[in-house]
């Protein structure tokens, strides 16, 4: 019967807002403070890596560990957290009828969530089947008399089923929720916008949400006034996409928290003292508007969503706080008990780490001692060995250059601060994802010095030679020859995930959100391009295998980056 009922989604949301408004609070300043802490101290190169891992067809225990480690880093940097709390509901503020309804709803919600998040059943293969393969598999199973292919997992928008292949699936719990502070920080850092611009844009989105659920058309109109909103991807699923995504739902949640004095459910705060009052108010609205828990797998309706979040942790902000440290699910942490009272245990909150300050030095060229040291270092380059070269940026304004010799494992990798900031921002959005602020401390003059010290008449291998040829010619190195392997884009990037998994730690500045333009104005999120890792994957693609050996940097870090000292106020 529940399936035949109509979910009046926004009407339910408004009704719950009105009834629970007294438990809501203004959280804007706290969220902005947490966002600033994340901007100052979170490793956004690892954020970019996690976003890449979440696009993989199949993710394993190693990927999950990286996600959990980054989630823990976020937890340590923010103040808005949910604390582990065992909620035991008894007759008192809640009647026995209330408790029976809550117990039934939690049980029904448990069944729905388990079917949605873990759709596999006995005999269903949870692998990387494309949409076409799934259809063929269904026909074959029907032909031999097995008709349970309908239980196969649903493919994503690109036709590929994405699954977690992990030993302990309980470790996935509470690792995927979005947080407004994290959404603000990622939009600012990876979109390369001022935090204030992000706040203003999400405030407008929140104002729309006060009257209706924002959709793609609303977002498109708002983007005209707030370009930062172009980073939002309306095609993103809301299930198992991690808190580092740019989905519309994540942005709407953040926008709701930017409204001062509102009664938005997102700003609800639950404590052990008001938990039963909140649940009683929820049941009152449920009865008045005939709300229910649906048996159909998929996204939760407003009542289901609120019930799950409130019962997951009875101490904190159920919608917006970091809950990565929580264990169990809503039905584990909130139970109905008609027995005598018992003491409730409560874990202590972890203290947030303080963001480290940073300072900027003034740029200077290579000193004589640096030039002499560079000459000695460049002597390690084998003039006769196969050598890959790749650059990011424009030939006349490169921002990253890498050389790699597969035979010895030696590589040269350095950066350059751009002169055309406007063009750099465009290239960052559609190619390399570098934040210009991360290039302020690179060593100036290194590009010309390294190119000048390359052995004469050297042969370099590349994927696309036009920009590289122009760069070499501009530095007077017309003697250097180029071999362009001319692979297709898909061929060249065949081993992209393997290379990033193994060597992603070598480069930490590709932190931005990068998209690729598609037909009819569409766009697709892609992994940022890194000159060094591109060289490694081009070598793997050209040989047809990825056989990672040991690699070593020719240039030490203090040659690539200038020393930075903090100024002391006198």
UniProtKB/Swiss-Prot annotation:
InterPro entries on file: Nucleocapsid_arenaviridae, Nucleocapsid_C_arenaviridae, Nucleocapsid_C_sf, Nucleocapsid_N_arenaviridae
Keyword Oxidoreductase assigned: no
Compartments it resides in: Virion; Host cytoplasm
Residue sites binding Mn(2+) per the record: 390, 392, 534
An annotated GO BP: symbiont-mediated suppression of host cytoplasmic pattern recognition receptor signaling pathway via inhibition of IKBKE activity
Cited function: Encapsidates the genome, protecting it from nucleases. The encapsidated genomic RNA is termed the nucleocapsid (NC). Serves as template for viral transcription and replication. The increased presence of protein N in host cell does not seem to trigger the switch from transcription to replication as observed in other negative strain RNA viruses.
Residues the record marks as site: Important for exonuclease activity: 467
Chain spans, region Binding site for the cap structure m7GTP: 54-241
Domain notes: The N-terminal region is important for the cap-binding activity while the C-terminal region contains the 3'-5' exoribonuclease activity. A CCHE zinc binding site is present in the C-terminal region and may thus contribute to the substrate binding and/or the specificity of the exonuclease activity.
Protein's organism: Ippy mammarenavirus (isolate Rat/Central African Republic/Dak An B 188 d/1970) (IPPYV)
EC numbers: 3.1.13.-
UniProt keywords, alphabetically: Capsid protein, Helical capsid protein, Host cytoplasm, Host-virus interaction, Hydrolase, Inhibition of host IKBKE by virus, Inhibition of host innate immune response by virus, Inhibition of host RLR pathway by virus, Interferon antiviral system evasion, Manganese, Metal-binding, Ribonucleoprotein, RNA-binding, Viral immunoevasion, Viral nucleoprotein, Virion, Zinc
Record has Magnesium as a keyword: no
SUBUNIT field: Homomultimerizes to form the nucleocapsid. Binds to viral genomic RNA. Interacts with glycoprotein G2. Interacts with protein Z; this interaction probably directs the encapsidated genome to budding sites. Interacts with protein L; this interaction does not interfere with Z-L interaction. Interacts with host IKBKE (via Protein kinase domain); the interaction inhibits IKBKE kinase activity.
GO molecular function, one term: RNA binding
Protein name from the UniProt record: Nucleoprotein
Region listing for Disordered, in residue ranges: 342-361
Main location: virion
Protein family membership: Belongs to the arenaviridae nucleocapsid protein family.
